[in-house]
Amino acid sequence: MSDMHSLLIAAILGVVEGLTEFLPVSSTGHMIIVGHLLGFEGDTAKTFEVVIQLGSILAVVVMFWRRLFGLIGIHFGRPLQHEGESKGRLTLIHILLGMIPAVVLGLLFHDTIKSLFNPINVMYALVVGGLLLIAAECLKPKEPRAPGLDDMTYRQAFMIGCFQCLALWPGFSRSGATISGGMLMGVSRYAASEFSFLLAVPMMMGATALDLYKSWGFLTSGDIPMFAVGFITAFVVALIAIKTFLQLIKRISFIPFAIYRFIVAAAVYVVFF
């Protein structure tokens, strides 16, 4: 593979990763399809995907840095609160409660989960995840009990964490699972999305660090330019995608995302079967 060709592949996959990582559409499903069409598969490809995920995570850190610092007691200017009177504040405990279920299951069944990474499982996960998005829109309370992040209870945070366990199924979408779970628990669509992004930082950093540790041997110095291009591209695109997504969900429901998931599932079937 020539240098220019590999850099082009890195840029394309960086765009795909950045666009889909935090949208409820399954970045895994998209990466599998695009990677296959580009002929970029195997151990190096898997390590590359792990590295560019770090770029997407960095975008969340940049977007929510004040809130993240606030979780550990460091405030810049006026403390962040939902407009109007708040029942409390989002704390580090909320994040920890949201992490515990998936962390426990992920550590216990890490190898089993990795063995599920194949097109057929991803295809089914895309469909089921789409159905969950539709269910969340149809069954959510008419008036959210937690309109803002600072209105969330510990119970809601923990239940969102339980829904996050569904994302251990490759192709389900971590953001899709957590946002749907939040809406079903009475959290507003916007606040559930924000919480999903905040929860992604420790969850994805932990999972990425573990994957990178296990695949470190596949890295070579010659991969650095390609990995750097993918990382930077994923970061920039994810930053734009998150900002756009948070504006978009103020105006539309998640039904279009569910329909799109069904289309991607059909694409997986056409490409691989």
Curated annotation (Swiss-Prot):
UniProt catalytic activity: di-trans,octa-cis-undecaprenyl diphosphate + H2O = di-trans,octa-cis-undecaprenyl phosphate + phosphate + H(+)
Keywords of the record: Antibiotic resistance, Cell inner membrane, Cell membrane, Cell shape, Cell wall biogenesis/degradation, Hydrolase, Membrane, Peptidoglycan synthesis, Transmembrane, Transmembrane helix
EC number(s) stated in the UniProt entry for this protein: 3.6.1.27
Domain of life (superkingdom): Bacteria
Membrane-topology descriptor: Multi-pass membrane protein
GO CC, alphabetical: plasma membrane
A GO biological-process term: response to antibiotic
Places the protein is found: Cell inner membrane
TM stretches of this protein: 6-26, 45-65, 90-110, 116-136, 190-210, 222-242, 252-272
EC top class, as a word: hydrolase
GO molecular function, one term: undecaprenyl-diphosphatase activity
The keyword Metal-binding is assigned to this record: no
Keyword Ribosomal protein: no
Family stated for the protein in its record: Belongs to the UppP family.
Function per UniProt: Catalyzes the dephosphorylation of undecaprenyl diphosphate (UPP). Confers resistance to bacitracin.
Note: Bacitracin is thought to be involved in the inhibition of peptidoglycan synthesis by sequestering undecaprenyl diphosphate, thereby reducing the pool of lipid carrier available.
HAMAP family found in the cross-reference section: Undec_diphosphatase
Name listed for the protein in its UniProt record: Undecaprenyl-diphosphatase
Gene name as annotated: uppP
